[in-house]
Amino acid sequence: NTSKHLVTTIKGLSEAQLNFKSSPDSWSIAECTEHIAISENNIFGMLEGALKTAADASKRADVKMTDEQILAMIVDRSNKVKTMEAFEPTGKFGNQEATLKAFLEKRKANIKFVKTTEEDLRNRYQQLPFGTIDAYQILLFMSAHTERSKSECKFSEELNNHK
């Protein structure tokens, strides 16, 4: 469970540990956590945008990537991607506790949506820089992105070196 892993990873860390950067161009654990919280919200916002349009099966052919390809592309850390400004950490939540709370609340709401939705997720679409994906694939993208962000931020490595 991603939420539990994130909580366990940062539980009990000092401010110095949360804000430590292994290099000037890397993100701290606090910044990684904020990026994950921002992304959870923003990517779900893309899904909400797709759901505002009518389902249209005639556009299925615009979706070129399979679910498996989406997941593989997102978690593949050799595929370096510059974070868009809207997803960069800015301190908007104020502190680590508020950041974690924002992520956990949004993740809980997103899971509830997934479990209860009756929306046609396969015939609504969103255009991303790498192509058109359907609304179901947006959910896969969101989930895989959180996993990738945890890996890229090297939580475990930094914790082991600085506890």
Each PLM stretch: what is its role?
Residues 2, 6, 39, 43, ...:
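Alpha-helical packing segments of well-folded alpha/beta enzyme cores
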Residues 5, 14, 74, 120, ...:
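Short, well-ordered helical secondary-structure segments
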Residues 9, 68-121:
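Acidic/histidine-rich alpha-helical segments that form the ligand environment
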Residues 12, 26, 93-94, 132:
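Short, conserved sequence motifs enriched in acidic/basic residues, glycine, and aromatics
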Residues 20-70, 115-163:
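Short, contiguous alpha-helical
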